[in-house]
Amino acid sequence: MKATCWILAGFCLLFCCKAEEGLNFPTYDGKDRVIDLNEKNYKHALKKYDMLCLLFHEPVSSDRVSQKQFQMTEMVLELAAQVLEPRSIGFGMVDSKKDAKLAKKLGLVEEGSLYVFKEERLIEFDGELATDVLVEFLLDLLEDPVEVINSKLELQAFDQIDDEIKLIGYFKGEDSEHYKAFEEAAEHFQPYVKFFATFDKGVAKKLGLKMNEVDFYEPFMDEPVHIPDKPYTEEELVEFVKEHKRATLRKLRPEDMFETWEDDMEGIHIVAFAEEDDPDGFEFLEILKQVARDNTDNPDLSIVWIDPDDFPLLITYWEKTFKIDLFRPQIGIVNVTDADSVWMEIRDDDDLPTAEELEDWIEDVLSGKINTEDDDDDDDDDDDDDDDDDDDDDDDDDDDDDDDDD
């Protein structure tokens, strides 16, 4: 993850306009809270805070641009540290060259990544390094790894969550060994995967759960998957979630965007752009959901849905890179190595593809009939055309010279 690329969205929090009391956005107060961590002070820092967040960064170059980028990154961390100071969350930086020995000791591997130490766990933040995104992520980490549901209203709230992976289990109580195994499994995925539990017989009946049984909900699916062979050990639950974590249709979220993008299918993503709040975008998304439900058993299919409204700073970049209009629904394949892409031809918003047409297009993608190499061939053809034009121009120039000689 390249930390400096995604900080501008949170950097805007450093400035504020005059507002009524109760809506004052925090501004940096000038106090330095981010620690330059080294072998002498790291043990004290780990003991001092309930959670410690460390940015593992490459050595900062002396050029002006690199210095500015680093200062802006540091400012994002400083503001987050200021906001979260009352909650005993500390922040620090580790230089990959100067503090290489410490980095190895702490298990820091990827430059540009932010690592969170919570008790005995090390969690990598793989999202947009913006103050608001980071603060929300850390507040989620402070919560219990399992949320308990014991009423009809809480069950309704659970049902409303449809764009994320979630698990729910029915247990005798908090002292149950099977619940404890479920809770320990949840810690492996917090806060990226939501774990729920109920001790209420009525709630369990509505969910169709038997004692010590756990259901796994894939995003946007109508029905859950019963995890087989109950009761489960912690290891069995962890293994099941890892095996089924790549959903048929998954949403790109600021808090884990890099992890999702890196989880490609042999270097390729099927990407769909659709604004959920836009009528055409909503309609297109519903078609995508239907396609995903009809093909949920296909292990080779995974579509990444991106709502452009979630990433306003990236809209211009995506439009320029992929040569598409993001004010309209789009679906295509993207090569994650070089960003080459091929997009389905959607004539206009009034003529969106049907679920059957989308399935046919996806089938062509999965079979290799449609691929990003076609895009390279088109580029080569364009280059050849340019060369031919240049040759024609040269021939014309030669003819003109002959005429002049005559």
Curated annotation (Swiss-Prot):
Skeletal and heart muscle. Keywords: Calcium, Glycoprotein, Muscle protein, Sarcoplasmic reticulum, Signal. GO terms for molecular function: calcium ion binding. This is Calsequestrin-2. Calsequestrin is a high-capacity, moderate affinity, calcium-binding protein and thus acts as an internal calcium store in muscle. Calcium ions are bound by clusters of acidic residues at the protein surface, especially at the interface between subunits. Can bind around 60 Ca(2+) ions. Regulates the release of lumenal Ca(2+) via the calcium release channel RYR2; this plays an important role in triggering muscle contraction. Plays a role in excitation-contraction coupling in the heart and in regulating the rate of heart beats. It comes from Gallus gallus. Residues 1-19 form the signal peptide. Residues 373-406 have a biased composition (Acidic residues). CDD domains: PDI_b'_Calsequestrin_C (cd03074), PDI_b_Calsequestrin_middle (cd03066), PDI_b_Calsequestrin_N (cd03065). Residues 365-406 are annotated as: Disordered. GO terms for biological process: regulation of cardiac muscle contraction by regulation of the release of sequestered calcium ion. InterPro entries: Calsequestrin, Calsequestrin_C, Calsequestrin_CS, Calsequestrin_middle_dom, Calsequestrin_N, Thioredoxin-like_sf. GO terms for cellular component: sarcoplasmic reticulum lumen; terminal cisterna; Z disc. It is found in: Sarcoplasmic reticulum lumen. The gene is CASQ2. Belongs to the calsequestrin family.
